[in-house]
């Protein structure tokens, strides 16, 4: 499942060189990491559900997920220092390309009424973030094994600081952006 990585090396680099008018291949935008995170919300107090969420994200990512803990106590949110707040996993290298390929080819087409990802998810520094409503679109997730359905946030970090260059890179990689704005 290394087709996306090979496509980047063999095809996309040359396309980016010509479209962005860059002669130095080291200046071309590339993927640095993908961060998948889940905020626990009301489920933070139940350790079994938190572990189930972590196991589900680990299955999806192919890498062990980490339960994130609160750094400070905030009375307004009923949150204490050291309390579990969510789950995250950071993917780099082969695992990153495998996940992105699975997301583009398998998971996103399984979303009901999917019309493409919004283009306004760029942060002004070349990174793209979007959210998914549930985890059932991934083939590794078995409906009977999950305790709660939850969404997830996915952030794709690129080496460029330009949203235009990052958009071009993700578009060439096959990200299904919505038509129009």
UniProtKB/Swiss-Prot annotation:
Question: Record's superkingdom?
Answer: Bacteria
SUPFAM superfamilies according to UniProt: RL5-like
Listed as disulfide-bonded, the cysteine pairs are none
One annotated Gene Ontology cellular component of this protein: ribosome
Q: Which family does it belong to?
A: Belongs to the universal ribosomal protein uL5 family.
Alphabetized NCBIfam families for the sequence: PRK00010.1
Protein name per Swiss-Prot or TrEMBL: Large ribosomal subunit protein uL5
Organism listed in the record: Helicobacter hepaticus (strain ATCC 51449 / 3B1)
């Amino acid at each position: 499942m290394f087709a996306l990585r090979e496509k980047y090396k063999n095809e996309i680099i040359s396309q980016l060189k010509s479209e962005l008018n860059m002669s130095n291949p080291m200046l071309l935008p590339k993927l640095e990491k993908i961060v998948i995170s889940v905020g626990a919300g009301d489920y933070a107090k139940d350790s079994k559900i938190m572990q189930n969420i972590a196991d589900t994200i680990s299955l999806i990512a192919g890498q062990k997920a980490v339960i994130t803990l609160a750094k400070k106590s905030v009375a307004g949110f009923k949150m204490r220092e050291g309390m579990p707040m969510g789950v995250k996993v950071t993917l780099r290298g082969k695992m990153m390309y495998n996940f992105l390929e699975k997301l583009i080819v398998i998971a996103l087409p399984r979303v009901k009424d999917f019309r493409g990802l919004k283009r306004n998810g760029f942060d002004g520094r070349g990174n793209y973030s979007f959210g998914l409503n549930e985890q059932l679109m991934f083939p590794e997730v078995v409906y009977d094994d999950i305790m709660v359905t939850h969404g997830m946030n996915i952030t794709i970090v690129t080496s460029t600081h330009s949203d235009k260059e990052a958009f071009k890179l993700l578009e060439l990689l096959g990200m299904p952006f919505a038509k129009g704005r």
